[in-house]
């Protein structure tokens, strides 16, 4: 009887350990170091996955790419929709072909409950009239993105990256810490927050990749005041084209079908502010939708643009 109880207790402990074990995504090359539940003064705790390329060495300096929605970057067996950016595969291929400089990827997981608040640019939102803010809140509530009155938390999210995460990465890994080697990237709302980051912190980020940028903020165009406010914000806050690179793109299917007309207005602002082929790309991809599979197919373009040797 005693041995049976011991056996059951041992089995329970082992089962608990297995359930609590964190399984890292499988990658084709390199390795992932995970910081579990990175604690912050500014945002909810979340995992951070650092991808190191094959042959990573403390004797070599690496550029850094911060990416949002970190749980969607690798290994489709672990993602909610079984799709992935396959960032490791794309970067490894480009490195083997000597098309990009050495880099590491810092994948910041989203918090499903606060993702929209974390990624929604706060300053443009705050310029809206109260009735317009109420409209945005109502649209997001109907879409299930918030249960309460909507308040962006993106300024705090960027403080987390700048004041807490970047110092950790700079101290822990063999990386360049300057603007010319610090980049940020994401898709959809992740595209918005990447653009907001380079505008708010032009001394920190030298480049941003904004794929399928979610210019509409909510999920409908009708009676939506935020796209125009984003355009106004860019008109006054874009960083210098002399020291920064910005990449945009969009498809024209599913959610991406709502972006091209706004993106063309953004393009006009980029030209007016002095951006040219050396500092800016906008790619239009007819037939492509709003998905990780679509972003994977063209990820090489912004990577080559930002990290070109």
Task: Please place each PLM-identified region on the residue numbering.
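Bacterial Sec-dependent N-terminal signal peptides
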Residues: 1-25
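Non-catalytic cap/lid and distal C-terminal segments of serine-dependent acyl enzymes
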Residues: 21-309
